[in-house]
Amino acid sequence: MDFSIKAFDTKNTLAAAKTGCVAVAVFENKKLSAAAKALDQHGDITAALKSGDISGKAGSTLLLRGLAGTSAQRVLLVGMGADETVSEKNFVSAVNAALKAFASLGATDAIIAFPVEQVKERDLNWAVRAIVIASNDAEFRADRQKSKRDPAPAGVRKVAIATPAATPALKAALAQSIAIGNGMNLTRELGNLSPNVCTPTYLAGVARELAGDYGFDVEVLDRKQLEALKMGSFLAVAKGSEEAPKFI
């Protein structure tokens, strides 16, 4: 998934955004988030809540197509619980629900316009990171060693996160979030590899490759260096394998 930060205001409005889908939050008390209100120009979202088509419970969803007054092809209503001061748990549930819905859409791009500044005891950077990491979790496939790999995820491939302003600090937070998510997925992938593949030598190679790609230093100690450092406990464990020990 490709992520970006998109700021909306009175001139560059959410309603005018041309995209495959906009995800906005609604609440159990039949109240609309600010983004939902901005799209509810003809009362269709309010009507959907009043009719009971969506409960507003965290993770509930309702897809509306061709909503009057909006340029988006689809509007996804996502429940975020009872409290407009959103809990961390409810925010993550809503994000996961939106991502699940995105995966089954014919659209290729979308906007997540959630109340990212209303999560209890969390800041905007946390909300951006939560969205990115949830996406990485949803897309991860443990199929590296399968003879037939799982098909690539369909649906939405580009997501813009709506925020009050696209500041350099927020863009840096997005870049950091993507890096964290990629690192988590690399860790999962290494952990899922069979031990005859993911050997100490293999791990050392991965470390050196990362160092070359991202410009940091890495040192890999071999058996002689470990003996010189008197790392007896480490070497004792390594004696149980034919593979040469490496300490990264």
Locations of regions flagged by a protein language model:
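Short amphipathic alpha-helical segment within the helicase RecA-like ATPase core
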Residues: 1-248
